[in-house]
């Protein structure tokens, strides 16, 4: 049986917040930050819901190294 995603709760909170605020990300920054904090606590690949943030970080690093 697969393990429960450790950051699933935070991802669900983001969905609830977005739905309650007409999908305005600016209104949900606090809950988005909580998910980022959760993702930072676990190794890469441990949480499926964190994969978007991991990809975002990889792209930022690639842009930095390419602009030198």
Swiss-Prot record:
<dbReference type="InterPro" id="IPR009069">
    <property type="entry name" value="Cys_alpha_HP_mot_SF"/>
</dbReference>
<dbReference type="GO" id="GO:0005739">
    <property type="term" value="C:mitochondrion"/>
</dbReference>
<keyword id="KW-1015">Disulfide bond</keyword>
<feature type="disulfide bond">
    <location>
        <begin position="39"/>
        <end position="50"/>
    </location>
</feature>
<feature type="disulfide bond">
    <location>
        <begin position="7"/>
        <end position="38"/>
    </location>
</feature>
<feature type="disulfide bond">
    <location>
        <begin position="17"/>
        <end position="28"/>
    </location>
</feature>
<dbReference type="InterPro" id="IPR027179">
    <property type="entry name" value="CMC4"/>
</dbReference>
<keyword id="KW-0496">Mitochondrion</keyword>
<protein>
    <recommendedName>
        <fullName>Cx9C motif-containing protein 4</fullName>
    </recommendedName>
</protein>
<comment type="similarity">
    <text>Belongs to the CMC4 family.</text>
</comment>
<feature type="short sequence motif" description="Cx9C motif 2">
    <location>
        <begin position="28"/>
        <end position="38"/>
    </location>
</feature>
<feature type="domain" description="CHCH">
    <location>
        <begin position="4"/>
        <end position="46"/>
    </location>
</feature>
<dbReference type="Pfam" id="PF08991">
    <property type="entry name" value="CMC4"/>
</dbReference>
<feature type="short sequence motif" description="Cx9C motif 1">
    <location>
        <begin position="7"/>
        <end position="17"/>
    </location>
</feature>
């Amino acid at each position: 049986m697969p393990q429960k995603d450790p950051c699933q709760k935070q991802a669900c909170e983001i969905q609830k917040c977005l739905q309650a605020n007409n999908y305005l990300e600016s209104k949900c920054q606090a809950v988005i930050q909580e998910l980022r904090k959760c993702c930072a606590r676990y190794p890469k690949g441990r949480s499926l819901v964190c994969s978007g943030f991991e990809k975002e970080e990889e792209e930022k690093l690639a842009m930095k190294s390419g602009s030198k």
